[in-house]
Each structure stands twice: as structure tokens, then as C-alpha cells.
Amino acid sequence: MFKDLRSLFVATALLIMSAAAASAQDSAQDYPQWRGRNRDGAASGFTEPKAWPEKLTRRWKVEVGEGYATPIVVGKTVYAFTRRDGAETMTALDAATGKLIWRTEYPAPYKVIDAAAAHGAGPKATPLFHGGNLYTVGVSGAVSAFNAATGKLLWQKPAPAEHPVFGMAASPIGDKDLVILHPGSYGPLTAYDANTGAVRWAADGNGAYASPIIVELGGVRQIVTMTQKNVISVAVADGAPLWERPWKSAGTDSAITPIVYGETIIVASQRMPVTALKPTRRDGKWVVEVVWENKDVSLFMSNPALIGDTLFGLSEKSSGQFFGIDAKTGKTLWLGQPREASNTAVVKAGDLLFMLNDDAELIVSRGSQTGFEPVKRYTVADSATWAQPAISGNRVFVKDVTSLALWTLK
């Protein structure tokens, strides 16, 4: 019996060491957080094939639970944050085979309002891999830290009394020893100590659904995000307010992650024009200038992607219309056909765009300044696909209603 236990211990230790080592491997192909390595919707390490296959090859498919957090990929492991039997669940799978490495869950009761019933009870925020750990925000706002190699729950902050109407959707971001997020509908933007969960600073501004970014402007590292009433910026180091710009979306539905273009920040939300802001510091004070506004396009939940000087995405207007906008001037370069999709998740790779519609159609298109140029269309699931895909190398990880699947080009 002792020998059997020793063998089990050794096998478990080897598995944990293997998972830990995987975290340090293949970093060029890691997709470790919301919208990828740089939070800009870029794929990691994709190489365009000489000829596109007629169909993608599904390598594996695993039931992981509900929710539409993006799967993240680190080394040889893919992580999924989902809901299973009333619990929010963090699952680690072997990226090559789909085999379970570990699974950790905690009770997370949540009642879905009727308007969001079709989307389920979440979770919606994408996990963050940072410093060897995983950080999650549950649909009710519970903040959790897990050891990425073992799944051990390191610390957890319980859900606040109130959360956004449609549940938490803003994904956490990491910087050095901080994890930063909006913990709830009326919670301030908050920086937690990544190791202990202690609050390091909190900045005013009720949370919306958009995820924050970190950018350096005027020599100052700052966090830019959307609140329910403003576009705001605070210093990463201490949360000190830097600048803000009034911004009122329909309801509180600001769900689009800001995009950095040169010295400007491009922001958008439901029934609002796509807008480029230029924050500058003059005589010690920040001034925010509107560089351009584009009223031809409005963005609801589909985050766009920037390729060179062109912004591509899906407008909510005309019941879903692909577009290209000149990021320098805000001029509309082209608008696609109406009713192309009700929602799409956009990932860029070189001059290519991967557009995963919510009906499980994956469109590969060329980032053109003259019009919509589809290259191939693939079906990648048997149910709705609200989660953004993770593209790591030439692997496409797709989360549908309850399953996670790996698709490859051959």
C-alpha cells in the first residue's frame, strides 16, 4: 500500500511539475488574457497557410460548462472559466489532447434576468494568467486567484452586494504585483495585491462591462477604461485620477475595450459614435481632445481590431454590418452588407481577420481598405458561440454553449 501511495505521489508531483513547466514554454504562442497578449485582439504566432483547407480539423471537444469567457492558452495548457451545476469552475486541460489536468470550483448562485436568459448565467469575464497564477471575476463579482499549475485556490474576495444588471463582464488586467479590475456595478476600479488579495488602491467610477487597458501616455503608465458615465484614466502605480471624458452609452452598456492608436484612444459603445480621444498633458494638467467621431458605425458587444491604420469590426447598425474605418481621420472606408451577423468576435493575425459569429460561423477575411474580403468560411460548433476564440499558433480554441474544442488547419 505504501508503495502504491508513493507511486501516486510521484505521478501527481510529475503532473504538477509538467503543468508548471508548460507555463514557461511556447510563450510566443501564449494567449494569456482577454483579447490576447497585448489586449488588442491579436492572435499569437499564427502563420497563414499557402492554401486554406475546405474544412478545419477538430482535434478534440470537451464538455467544460456554460459561460462565454474566452479560453486562455499558456504553454501546453488551455484554461476555461465556466459554470457547472451552480458552481463557477476553473478547468485546466492539456491543449494538445483536451485531457483534464485539474478542475477547481466554488459555489456561485446567480439568477439571470429575463433579458439575458439566452446568454445563460455566465461567467463572462475572461481569466488572466499573470505571474504563474490565474485570476478570475465571477458573474456576481467574486474575485479569485488560483495556482495555474495545481488549481489551488490561493485567495478569494466574495461577490459584492450589487453587480451590473447583466452580470460582471469586465476582465482583469495585471501589472507587476497588481491585479486590477472593476469588482461590481457600484464598485470602484480596484487594484489587488496579486499574492494576497489585499486592496492596494481604489479609484472612483462605477463599473461598466468594458475591460481596462494599460497604456503609456505623456510618459505616464495609466489604466484607461469605461465607467457607467465616463472614459477614465488613472495612474497604474497608485490609482490617482489623471483624466476623464464624459461618456454615456445607452443604459450602462459600455462593453467595448478601448483601443490604442498612436497617441489616441479609440472608444465606442451602444448607440454612440466611434470616437478617437487624444489625452495630452499641458502645464501639469491633462486635456482630452476629440480627434474625430464616426457616426456611421456604432458598437454594442463586438470589439473591433486595428490593422495598421484601419479599424475593422461589426457595427450594430443595419442589424450587423462589417466595416472599415480610417483610424487617422475617422472616415468610413467601407460598409458591408446589412444583417451579416448579430454579434462577432474579432481576432487579427497579420493582415487577416478571424470573425467568429455567434451562430458558430468562423469567417476568415482580408483586412482590406476597400471592402469586405472573405477568404474562407468555416462552421466550428454545433451551438451558439458568444465567447471570443483563442488563436495560439495555428490552433483555434472555440468555446460554444457548454463545450471547448480545438480546431486546426490540417
Q: What residue spans do the PLM features occupy?
A:
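Hydrophobic helical h-region of N-terminal Sec-dependent signal peptides
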Residues: 10-21
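Noncatalytic, solvent-exposed loop/strand surfaces
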Residues: 22-410
